[in-house]
């Protein structure tokens, strides 16, 4: 149970059944269910593990930057995204992971000793906007979770009512389009801010990269 205060009431309600009621958190389908404390404990454990993996990947990136970048984009990012979409309020806890990416992985991939903040912001943009698609996780955590809740709301409502029908496909499609439109608007606004902080040469190079991608 998420709220320990309801333990006694729940125990009475399900008395005589085989249902096991606990106030301890549980892991379910790769996410955490339970109290805020359990969420944080579970998340810190995950994040510590990922930080170590990022540092190992950074060592590999010094000699194989393209392979390391591909492994990160097609592997690690998807794991992070699932985590952000299933556990709320993870922004602050993700700071060590962002630091591992910025201080270890990105310098190794780019062949430099350090990454400036304007560069980091640029690399966080989607590839179609001239970036590398390497997100700043603390910046996107809240948005990722809220859009996940929005998309799954129709199914969640049916489950709460113990219904047997799937959500209306048209409703799901409409919600997905709304979420995509919102995401595109946010990315476009961020792009404008990022470009405004770049020097003229870099900004021009970004525009040229976008033109090549669009063909």
What are these regions (language model features)?
Residues 141-215:
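Charged boundary/loop elements
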Residues 19-20, 39, 72, 121, ...:
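Helix-centric, low-specificity signal for extended rod-like, repetitive segments
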Residues 11, 32-33, 101, 204-206, ...:
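Intrinsic disorder/low-complexity segments
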Residues 14, 65, 71-72, 90, ...:
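Short intrinsically disordered, low-complexity segments
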Residues 1-24:
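Short, conserved micro-motifs composed of acidic
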Residues 1-2, 26-160:
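Non-catalytic, peripheral interaction segments enriched in hydrophobic/basic residues
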